[in-house]
Amino acid sequence: MDEFQREGNKHRFWQQCFLYQIFFGEDLNAMVHDHHLDRSSSFERTEILISNYFSFLTVKRLIRRIRQQNDSTGLFGNCDPNQFIDRNRNSYSESVLEALTVILEVSFAMRSKHFLEGINGWKSIRSIHCIFPLMEDKFPYSNYISDIRVPYSIHPELLVRTFRRWIRDTPSLHLLRFILHSWKNSFSAENLQKAMVAPRENMRLSLFLWNSYVYECESFLVPLLKRFSHSQSLLYGSFPNXNHFVRKIKHIVIFPXINISTXRIWLLKDPFIQYVRYGERSLIALKGTHLQVKKCRYHLFHFWQYYFHLWSQPYRICILELSKNYSFFLGYFLSFKMKPLVVRTKMLNDLFITNLITNELNPIAPIRSILFFLAKERFCDISGQTISKLSWTSLSDDDILDRFDRICRNLFHYYSGSINPDGLYYIKYILLLPCAKTLACKHKSTIRVVREESGSELFTKSFSKEREFISSSFSKTRSQRERFWNSDIIQINPLSNSWQKIQNKQVEN
């Protein structure tokens, strides 16, 4: 990948205009073939499902066959489109998809680099671990928050139109359109969600298309927010020349001319805008009146429709008042509460006492959602009654304890910044009893017998590291009034996605 990027910097214009020629390079096909062999060998233990004889001439003939196809069902033979996420399909079609993904990734990397260099004054932090500290420091200064959901279902022509803005190679666009229409079911919400949760699935092209689509949205949205943040409060009636003012507004807001009306227009007064995103969720913190925030929501709706030709449902952009509502983001219920603060100031012989009111972030762990997830995984039922894991009885005692220990430790590590640790201790109690019942079922005895035979060190050895971490993190939180964020996104990602999916269904209903 680095080698292709270095070559692309020398011949950037050539790559954008003649990307299709790179398909016939043997270096690219060899790299894709080796990558496919390595991935298949890691997933398939018994045999490798790829032919030992790989011919570059066959790949070229396959590309020529694709160009001559008229029926979209014959792209990769008479195969089922649902086999896009199946590892048992033809190796040559796999190589074509991998080669197309590599070429698009290289061209996309060069374009995104130039875009980030062109944005001055807008600080961008790409680490997922910086989201919660940023929200804790910056969001309390805002009074409204806009919760945006990026649509998962993407039409193939919308993706092709996006790539046409920075790729001028017609054969590559035709090949991309052919693949997208042949496998359009693979870019649905379920398959994209599966690709984000389970990276083992072969969904590299789907993830790249999703990331490029989100990047295209942000490439227009971030400059728009930047212009809003640097603008001043202006009133239409204060300008003697109304046409001159409308031209200024048209320059500030980058929407088409039909969106600008001659009515009174207010921009944000002392704007304070913060933008964070993870997955399909985006949060925009705003400071202003309710009317001003509604105007921003109106602009976002038109931004989505005119630039991406996509009808955005009203429930996908929600405006919440921070002092009265909460938002569900990354597995947390986020709310802000007013906190009184007394400040004493001494000047010469006078002592002044000032009462200040500040907003404080209160992240709450969704105990009911965690309980629902444990019930779904058959650790307990909906009411909280514990159930033994019969499928784990074939494991050793150490493996059983280690699995329960890992689940409990991951939950406490991720929700170390929450303000309701008592609910997490209840989740720990629910996990302890299934662990004991599983061991008792394995040894065909009761919990008391297992405890007596194994001794008191059976459960004290388990969850020991978790107990030390809990005591240290919560004591630090209460003493120094600082939260300890340990966002292990990789391990908690399936939990966050499942809870977010439940929350989305509640919002839609």
Curated annotation (Swiss-Prot):
Cellular component GO terms, alphabetical: chloroplast
Domain of life: Eukaryota
InterPro entries noted in UniProt: Domain_X, Maturase_MatK, Maturase_MatK_N
Pfam families for the chain: Intron_maturas2, MatK_N
Span of the signal peptide: none
Keywords per UniProt: Chloroplast, mRNA processing, Plastid, RNA-binding, tRNA processing
Single GO BP term: tRNA processing
GO MF annotations, alphabetized: RNA binding
Disulfide bond entries: none
Protein's cellular compartments: Plastid, Chloroplast
Role: Usually encoded in the trnK tRNA gene intron. Probably assists in splicing its own and other chloroplast group II introns.
Family statement: Belongs to the intron maturase 2 family. MatK subfamily.
Protein name according to UniProt: Maturase K
Gene behind this protein: matK
